[in-house]
Protein backbone atom coordinates (compact mmCIF):
# COMPACT_ATOMS: atom_id res chain seq x y z
CA UNK A 1 0.00 0.00 0.00
CA UNK A 2 1.29 3.45 -0.88
CA UNK A 3 1.94 5.78 2.03
CA UNK A 4 2.90 9.45 2.07
CA UNK A 5 5.13 10.79 4.83
CA UNK A 6 3.97 14.37 5.41
CA UNK A 7 5.97 16.86 7.48
CA UNK A 8 4.48 20.09 8.80
CA UNK A 9 1.09 18.39 8.88
CA UNK A 10 -0.35 20.92 11.35
CA UNK A 11 0.72 24.04 9.41
CA UNK A 12 -1.58 26.11 7.22
CA UNK A 13 -0.68 24.12 4.09
CA UNK A 14 -0.10 20.78 5.80
CA UNK A 15 -3.51 20.83 7.49
CA UNK A 16 -5.34 21.19 4.16
CA UNK A 17 -3.07 18.70 2.41
CA UNK A 18 -3.55 16.09 5.15
CA UNK A 19 -7.33 16.40 4.87
CA UNK A 20 -7.30 16.16 1.06
CA UNK A 21 -4.97 13.13 1.11
CA UNK A 22 -7.32 11.34 3.49
CA UNK A 23 -10.34 12.33 1.38
CA UNK A 24 -8.58 10.83 -1.65
CA UNK A 25 -8.01 7.58 0.24
CA UNK A 26 -4.24 8.02 0.16
CA UNK A 27 -2.43 6.56 3.17
CA UNK A 28 -0.49 9.17 5.10
CA UNK A 29 1.92 9.27 8.03
CA UNK A 30 1.62 12.86 9.32
CA UNK A 31 4.36 14.51 11.36
CA UNK A 32 4.31 17.90 13.05
CA UNK A 33 7.42 19.80 14.14
CA UNK A 34 6.73 18.43 17.64
CA UNK A 35 6.56 14.79 16.54
CA UNK A 36 9.46 15.07 14.07
CA UNK A 37 12.06 17.80 14.41
CA UNK A 38 13.51 17.81 10.90
CA UNK A 39 16.62 19.65 12.11
CA UNK A 40 17.71 16.37 13.73
CA UNK A 41 19.30 14.17 11.07
CA UNK A 42 19.17 10.87 12.95
CA UNK A 43 15.53 11.44 13.96
CA UNK A 44 14.58 12.02 10.33
CA UNK A 45 16.50 9.00 9.05
CA UNK A 46 14.87 6.76 11.68
CA UNK A 47 11.33 8.05 11.05
CA UNK A 48 11.67 7.47 7.31
CA UNK A 49 13.20 4.01 7.81
CA UNK A 50 10.35 3.08 10.16
CA UNK A 51 7.57 4.37 7.90
CA UNK A 52 9.04 3.27 4.53
CA UNK A 53 6.91 5.81 2.62
CA UNK A 54 6.31 5.78 -1.13
CA UNK A 55 6.69 9.57 -1.25
CA UNK A 56 7.82 12.26 1.21
CA UNK A 57 6.09 15.66 1.12
CA UNK A 58 7.86 18.41 3.06
CA UNK A 59 5.56 21.20 4.20
CA UNK A 60 7.65 21.99 7.29
CA UNK A 61 9.40 25.35 7.16
CA UNK A 62 10.56 28.36 9.12
CA UNK A 63 8.39 31.09 7.56
CA UNK A 64 8.73 34.21 9.73
CA UNK A 65 10.34 36.47 7.13
CA UNK A 66 11.21 39.33 9.49
CA UNK A 67 12.23 37.25 12.50
CA UNK A 68 14.57 35.24 10.26
CA UNK A 69 16.81 38.31 10.08
CA UNK A 70 17.69 37.81 13.77
CA UNK A 71 17.19 34.02 13.87
CA UNK A 72 19.39 33.11 10.93
CA UNK A 73 20.73 29.90 12.47
CA UNK A 74 17.23 28.58 13.19
CA UNK A 75 15.93 29.54 9.74
CA UNK A 76 18.81 27.67 8.08
CA UNK A 77 18.52 24.72 10.46
CA UNK A 78 14.90 24.17 9.39
CA UNK A 79 14.86 25.37 5.78
CA UNK A 80 18.27 24.13 4.63
CA UNK A 81 19.35 21.36 6.98
CA UNK A 82 15.85 19.97 7.51
CA UNK A 83 15.31 19.77 3.77
CA UNK A 84 18.70 18.07 3.37
CA UNK A 85 17.91 15.46 6.02
CA UNK A 86 14.59 14.62 4.39
CA UNK A 87 16.19 14.38 0.93
CA UNK A 88 18.93 12.09 2.27
CA UNK A 89 16.36 9.90 4.03
CA UNK A 90 14.11 9.79 0.96
CA UNK A 91 17.02 8.73 -1.25
CA UNK A 92 17.95 5.97 1.21
CA UNK A 93 14.51 4.33 0.89
CA UNK A 94 14.13 5.14 -2.83
CA UNK A 95 11.18 7.49 -2.24
CA UNK A 96 10.69 10.68 -4.26
CA UNK A 97 10.51 13.93 -2.28
CA UNK A 98 8.12 16.81 -2.93
CA UNK A 99 9.32 20.03 -1.33
CA UNK A 100 7.59 23.42 -1.02
CA UNK A 101 9.62 26.57 -1.65
CA UNK A 102 8.94 30.26 -2.17
CA UNK A 103 8.96 33.33 -4.40
CA UNK A 104 11.47 34.82 -1.93
CA UNK A 105 14.30 33.02 -3.74
CA UNK A 106 13.96 35.84 -6.32
CA UNK A 107 14.67 39.55 -5.84
CA UNK A 108 11.55 40.71 -7.69
CA UNK A 109 13.47 42.89 -10.14
CA UNK A 110 11.74 41.43 -13.20
CA UNK A 111 8.63 42.91 -14.79
CA UNK A 112 7.48 39.70 -16.48
CA UNK A 113 6.43 36.45 -14.77
CA UNK A 114 9.23 34.37 -13.29
CA UNK A 115 9.99 31.02 -14.92
CA UNK A 116 11.70 28.18 -13.09
CA UNK A 117 15.08 28.79 -14.75
CA UNK A 118 15.30 32.50 -13.89
CA UNK A 119 18.29 33.57 -11.84
CA UNK A 120 17.72 33.44 -8.09
CA UNK A 121 18.80 36.30 -5.84
CA UNK A 122 17.14 36.32 -2.42
CA UNK A 123 16.91 39.64 -0.59
CA UNK A 124 16.97 38.32 2.97
CA UNK A 125 17.69 35.41 5.30
CA UNK A 126 14.36 33.65 4.75
CA UNK A 127 14.84 33.52 0.97
CA UNK A 128 18.50 32.56 1.37
CA UNK A 129 17.58 29.67 3.67
CA UNK A 130 14.84 28.41 1.35
CA UNK A 131 17.15 28.59 -1.67
CA UNK A 132 19.82 26.71 0.27
CA UNK A 133 17.22 24.02 1.00
CA UNK A 134 16.40 23.71 -2.69
CA UNK A 135 20.09 23.35 -3.53
CA UNK A 136 20.60 20.64 -0.90
CA UNK A 137 17.68 18.63 -2.27
CA UNK A 138 18.95 18.89 -5.85
CA UNK A 139 22.39 17.75 -4.70
CA UNK A 140 21.22 14.83 -2.55
CA UNK A 141 18.27 13.33 -4.43
CA UNK A 142 17.53 13.38 -8.18
CA UNK A 143 13.99 12.17 -7.48
CA UNK A 144 12.65 15.52 -6.35
CA UNK A 145 9.81 17.87 -7.18
CA UNK A 146 10.28 21.39 -5.82
CA UNK A 147 7.18 23.60 -5.96
CA UNK A 148 7.71 27.31 -5.41
CA UNK A 149 4.63 29.25 -4.37
CA UNK A 150 3.74 32.82 -3.40
CA UNK A 151 1.52 34.81 -1.04
CA UNK A 152 0.15 31.69 0.65
CA UNK A 153 -3.01 31.94 2.76
CA UNK A 154 -5.63 29.58 4.13
CA UNK A 155 -8.18 28.94 6.84
CA UNK A 156 -5.48 27.67 9.21
CA UNK A 157 -2.45 29.38 10.70
CA UNK A 158 -1.31 32.99 10.37
CA UNK A 159 -1.53 34.75 7.00
CA UNK A 160 -2.36 38.03 5.29
CA UNK A 161 -6.07 37.32 4.78
CA UNK A 162 -6.68 36.50 8.43
CA UNK A 163 -4.61 39.49 9.54
CA UNK A 164 -6.63 41.86 7.35
CA UNK A 165 -9.90 40.39 8.65
CA UNK A 166 -8.73 40.86 12.24
CA UNK A 167 -7.55 44.43 11.70
CA UNK A 168 -10.69 45.31 9.72
CA UNK A 169 -12.80 44.15 12.67
CA UNK A 170 -10.81 46.37 15.05
CA UNK A 171 -10.21 49.55 13.04
CA UNK A 172 -12.16 51.91 10.77
CA UNK A 173 -9.18 52.57 8.48
CA UNK A 174 -6.20 50.53 7.30
CA UNK A 175 -3.02 51.31 5.38
CA UNK A 176 -1.72 48.63 3.00
CA UNK A 177 1.28 48.50 0.65
CA UNK A 178 0.38 48.90 -3.03
CA UNK A 179 3.79 48.74 -4.75
CA UNK A 180 4.35 44.99 -4.25
CA UNK A 181 2.78 42.83 -6.95
CA UNK A 182 2.11 39.11 -6.92
CA UNK A 183 -0.44 36.33 -6.94
CA UNK A 184 -2.16 35.04 -3.79
CA UNK A 185 -2.25 31.26 -3.40
CA UNK A 186 -4.95 29.41 -1.46
CA UNK A 187 -3.55 26.48 0.51
CA UNK A 188 -6.31 24.17 -0.70
CA UNK A 189 -5.47 24.84 -4.35
CA UNK A 190 -1.76 24.26 -3.72
CA UNK A 191 -2.63 21.07 -1.81
CA UNK A 192 -4.58 19.85 -4.84
CA UNK A 193 -1.57 20.59 -7.05
CA UNK A 194 0.68 18.65 -4.67
CA UNK A 195 -1.67 15.66 -4.92
CA UNK A 196 -1.25 15.74 -8.72
CA UNK A 197 2.51 15.45 -8.12
CA UNK A 198 2.03 12.74 -5.48
CA UNK A 199 -0.01 10.59 -7.87
CA UNK A 200 2.66 10.89 -10.57
CA UNK A 201 5.39 10.06 -8.05
CA UNK A 202 3.52 6.99 -6.76
CA UNK A 203 3.11 5.72 -10.33
CA UNK A 204 6.84 6.11 -10.84
CA UNK A 205 6.52 8.45 -13.82
CA UNK A 206 6.92 11.80 -12.08
CA UNK A 207 8.67 14.46 -14.17
CA UNK A 208 11.17 15.59 -11.56
CA UNK A 209 12.40 19.16 -11.28
CA UNK A 210 11.31 22.62 -10.15
CA UNK A 211 7.85 24.11 -10.69
CA UNK A 212 6.01 27.36 -10.00
CA UNK A 213 2.47 27.37 -8.60
CA UNK A 214 0.19 30.24 -7.59
CA UNK A 215 -3.42 31.09 -8.29
CA UNK A 216 -4.16 32.79 -11.61
CA UNK A 217 -4.30 36.57 -11.80
CA UNK A 218 -2.10 39.37 -10.51
CA UNK A 219 -2.74 41.89 -7.75
CA UNK A 220 -1.11 44.10 -5.13
CA UNK A 221 -1.35 43.69 -1.37
CA UNK A 222 -3.55 46.81 -1.38
CA UNK A 223 -6.00 45.51 -3.98
CA UNK A 224 -5.97 42.09 -2.33
CA UNK A 225 -6.97 43.70 0.99
CA UNK A 226 -9.83 45.58 -0.72
CA UNK A 227 -11.15 42.29 -2.11
CA UNK A 228 -10.83 40.56 1.27
CA UNK A 229 -12.88 43.21 3.08
CA UNK A 230 -15.44 43.54 0.27
CA UNK A 231 -16.00 39.78 0.03
CA UNK A 232 -16.21 39.36 3.81
CA UNK A 233 -18.75 42.16 4.12
CA UNK A 234 -20.74 40.59 1.29
CA UNK A 235 -20.92 37.41 3.36
CA UNK A 236 -22.37 39.30 6.30
CA UNK A 237 -19.20 39.89 8.31
CA UNK A 238 -19.61 42.93 10.56
CA UNK A 239 -16.28 44.63 9.87
CA UNK A 240 -15.59 48.14 11.23
CA UNK A 241 -13.22 49.07 8.41
CA UNK A 242 -14.55 51.80 6.10
CA UNK A 243 -11.41 52.85 4.22
CA UNK A 244 -8.13 51.29 3.13
CA UNK A 245 -5.36 53.66 2.07
CA UNK A 246 -2.57 52.63 -0.33
CA UNK A 247 0.97 53.24 0.92
CA UNK A 248 4.49 52.70 -0.39
CA UNK A 249 6.71 49.92 0.90
CA UNK A 250 9.05 52.66 2.15
CA UNK A 251 6.23 53.93 4.40
CA UNK A 252 5.97 50.53 6.08
CA UNK A 253 9.50 49.69 7.23
CA UNK A 254 10.19 46.04 8.04
CA UNK A 255 13.38 44.19 9.06
CA UNK A 256 13.39 42.09 5.87
CA UNK A 257 13.17 43.32 2.29
CA UNK A 258 10.33 41.93 0.16
CA UNK A 259 10.52 41.23 -3.59
CA UNK A 260 8.46 43.97 -5.28
CA UNK A 261 7.34 41.60 -8.07
CA UNK A 262 6.37 38.00 -7.29
CA UNK A 263 4.41 36.82 -10.31
CA UNK A 264 5.04 33.27 -11.54
CA UNK A 265 4.75 31.75 -15.00
CA UNK A 266 2.78 28.58 -14.25
CA UNK A 267 2.84 27.07 -17.72
CA UNK A 268 5.21 24.25 -16.80
CA UNK A 269 3.21 22.83 -13.89
CA UNK A 270 -0.10 23.33 -15.69
CA UNK A 271 1.06 21.47 -18.79
CA UNK A 272 3.09 18.76 -17.03
CA UNK A 273 0.36 17.70 -14.62
CA UNK A 274 -2.59 18.68 -16.82
CA UNK A 275 -4.14 20.82 -14.10
CA UNK A 276 -6.54 23.74 -14.03
CA UNK A 277 -5.45 26.64 -11.82
CA UNK A 278 -8.25 28.75 -10.30
CA UNK A 279 -8.19 32.57 -10.27
CA UNK A 280 -7.24 34.09 -6.92
CA UNK A 281 -10.55 35.95 -6.61
CA UNK A 282 -12.57 32.74 -6.90
CA UNK A 283 -10.29 30.99 -4.43
CA UNK A 284 -10.49 33.86 -1.94
CA UNK A 285 -14.28 33.62 -2.09
CA UNK A 286 -14.13 29.86 -1.50
CA UNK A 287 -11.77 30.26 1.44
CA UNK A 288 -13.94 32.94 3.06
CA UNK A 289 -17.00 30.73 2.58
CA UNK A 290 -15.20 28.03 4.55
CA UNK A 291 -14.04 30.52 7.19
CA UNK A 292 -17.52 31.91 7.76
CA UNK A 293 -19.52 28.79 6.94
CA UNK A 294 -17.33 26.35 8.82
CA UNK A 295 -17.32 23.79 6.00
CA UNK A 296 -14.74 22.66 3.48
CA UNK A 297 -15.42 22.84 -0.25
Describe each model-derived feature in a short phrase:
Residues 22-46:
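Adenosine-cofactor binding site in Rossmann-like domains, unifying the SAM/SAH pocket
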Amino acid sequence: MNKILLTGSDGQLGTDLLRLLKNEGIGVAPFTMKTLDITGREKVLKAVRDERPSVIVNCAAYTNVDKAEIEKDLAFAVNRDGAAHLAEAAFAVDAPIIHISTDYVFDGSKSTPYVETDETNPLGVYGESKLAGEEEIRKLHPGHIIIRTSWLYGAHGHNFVKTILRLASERESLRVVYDQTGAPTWTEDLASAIIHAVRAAVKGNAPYGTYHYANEGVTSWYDFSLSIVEEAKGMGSQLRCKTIAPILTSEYPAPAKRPPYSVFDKGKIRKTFNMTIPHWKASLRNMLNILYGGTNA
